[in-house]
């Protein structure tokens, strides 16, 4: 990996340790700074409350000029999360900017949990349910939250 990307990832990690956003944690693998594990805790007073959701972030030597590949490892039910865990979020695609760091990425994903974009669905069933039957959508989200407690 190129030195600028490595330096930036070390800086991102240091910032995340020193000033972690609420409900978010993340760290690189022991021997690989380009592969990170992260956890997002479901925001309080939302259907996601109490959930512990695992993600991976894979960076390339083009970071921070190109976004990482981010995927949920935890099973999710959300309009903007594909079955394979990949996330439909503008800052991870066409709205990416080098000013975003790991903390900003994870915070944006945490915000997306509670504020999905049903007009850009990755999961059409979840998007339809979110728009047409919020009670049933919230029930499915609670199932995912409960599964997050026992998942590896």
From Swiss-Prot:
EC number(s) recorded for this UniProt protein: 2.3.2.23
Enzyme class: transferase
Annotated UBC core domain residues: 4-150
Family affiliation: Belongs to the ubiquitin-conjugating enzyme family.
Gene: UBC2
Tagged with keyword Lipid metabolism: no
InterPro entries: Ub_conjugating_enzyme, UBQ-conjugat_E2_core, UBQ-conjugating_AS, UBQ-conjugating_enzyme/RWD
Molecular function in Gene Ontology: ATP binding; ubiquitin conjugating enzyme activity
Pathway of action: Protein modification; protein ubiquitination
GO biological process, one term: protein polyubiquitination
Biological classification of the source: Eukaryota, Viridiplantae, Streptophyta, Embryophyta, Tracheophyta
Active site: 88
Catalysis performed (reactions): S-ubiquitinyl-[E1 ubiquitin-activating enzyme]-L-cysteine + [E2 ubiquitin-conjugating enzyme]-L-cysteine = [E1 ubiquitin-activating enzyme]-L-cysteine + S-ubiquitinyl-[E2 ubiquitin-conjugating enzyme]-L-cysteine
Highest taxon listed in the record's lineage: Eukaryota
Name of the protein this chain belongs to: Ubiquitin-conjugating enzyme E2 2
Presence of keyword ATP-binding: yes
Annotated function: Catalyzes the covalent attachment of ubiquitin to other proteins.
This protein's UniProt keywords: ATP-binding, Nucleotide-binding, Transferase, Ubl conjugation pathway
């Amino acid at each position: 990996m190129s030195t600028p990307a490595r330096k930036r990832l070390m800086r991102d990690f240091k910032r995340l340790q020193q000033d972690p956003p609420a409900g978010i944690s993340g760290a690189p693998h022991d021997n690989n700074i380009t592969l990170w594990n992260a956890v997002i805790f479901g925001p309080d007073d939302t259907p996601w409350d109490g959930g512990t959701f695992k993600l991976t972030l894979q960076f390339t030597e083009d970071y921070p000029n190109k976004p990482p590949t981010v995927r949920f490892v935890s099973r999710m039910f959300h309009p903007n999360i594909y079955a394979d865990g990949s996330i439909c979020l503008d800052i991870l695609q066409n709205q990416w900017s080098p000013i975003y760091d790991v903390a900003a990425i994870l915070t944006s994903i945490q915000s997306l949990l509670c504020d999905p974009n049903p007009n850009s669905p990755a999961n059409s069933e979840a998007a339809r349910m979110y728009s047409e039957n919020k009670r049933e959508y919230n029930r499915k989200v609670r199932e995912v939250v409960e599964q997050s407690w026992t998942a590896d």
